[in-house]
Amino acid sequence: MLRKKHFSWMLVILILIAVLSFIKLPYYITKPGEATELASLIKVEGGYPEKGSLSLMTVKVGPANPFTYVWAKMHPYYEIVPDESIKEEGESDKEYMKRQLQMMKSSQENAVIAAYQKAGKKVSYSFNGIYASSVVENMPAKGKIEVGDKIISADGKNYQSAEKLIDYISSKKAGDKVTLKIEREEKEKRVTLTLKQFPDEPDRAGIGVSLYTDRNVKVEPDIDFEIENIGGPSAGLMMSLEIYNQLTKPDETKGYDIAGTGTIDVDGKVGPIGGIDQKVVAADKAGKDIFFAPNQNGASNSDYKNAVKTAKDIDSNMKIVPVDTMQDAIDYLNKLKAKST
């Protein structure tokens, strides 16, 4: 009888868990992802091999249900974020992934241009425009800018990359205005927006729109990407280092397993990303030796400083290295002695 009662309770619990797993909450759960070595995903024709490795970092994202919500509450480095922080209002999963993959494509192009220029190799590109890929809820661009809008100019000045335009807008402060000339459905219009502080980043002000650059890139030697189902712009730095390492001698890794994160622009400037603590945790779990983190020119709440804190909290032996540019990372690697075996 006791065994039957025990079995009944177990069955009830299993059914309850199954039912709860199908209840969608208005949240997403983010958690540490994986370290993915880039040598097998990026192939430069005639590229040089490496003794160590260069890896991009991912954060896993999934919809929350009551079960995963409670689970996330009990685990460090799991974060519960509102739907609107991940997806736009009315955006389907397919549309969200398309947007993420578009940002990855733009990031790959930036990495290629930065690396080939740094290595002194042939690279040329034509500019097709800057486009809006997402609009943040409760920010000035909401209702004024739509996904797919082409941004022609800001305050009368044209820009040749999303990064340069973002830098210009970021140079302003909360309360300042910016006038954008946009094209939507083959019609041009002007919108004036007043910058506002980001709710989760009070040190930063902006209009709340994500942008990407559309361009055609030609290089010599040829390069091939085999990165699938990984979206977003945060792998830019590590992709640029992998490409550069395949284009040049000697091997920059010197036998070390190197991870890192950060956006990249065509000039090799490194930008901040999200989920730095989760990426540090994932890199440590993967046994990486070195982790490059955006320094943001020494900002008080930079990704680098948060990465250092996380590494200390989890008692990691990884060396956390601050970088503002691709060249900073190369300079650091050039000074390293080869890893002893």
Curated annotation (Swiss-Prot):
* Name of one Pfam family that matches: PDZ_2
Q: Which residues cross the membrane?
A: 9-29
The subcellular localization recorded is:
Cell membrane
Protein name in UniProt: Uncharacterized protein YlbL
Q: Which residues form the PDZ domain?
A: 100-186
An example Gene Ontology biological process: proteolysis
**Active site positions, chain numbering:** 234, 279
Write down the CDD domains for this protein, in alphabetical order: cpPDZ_BsYlbL-like
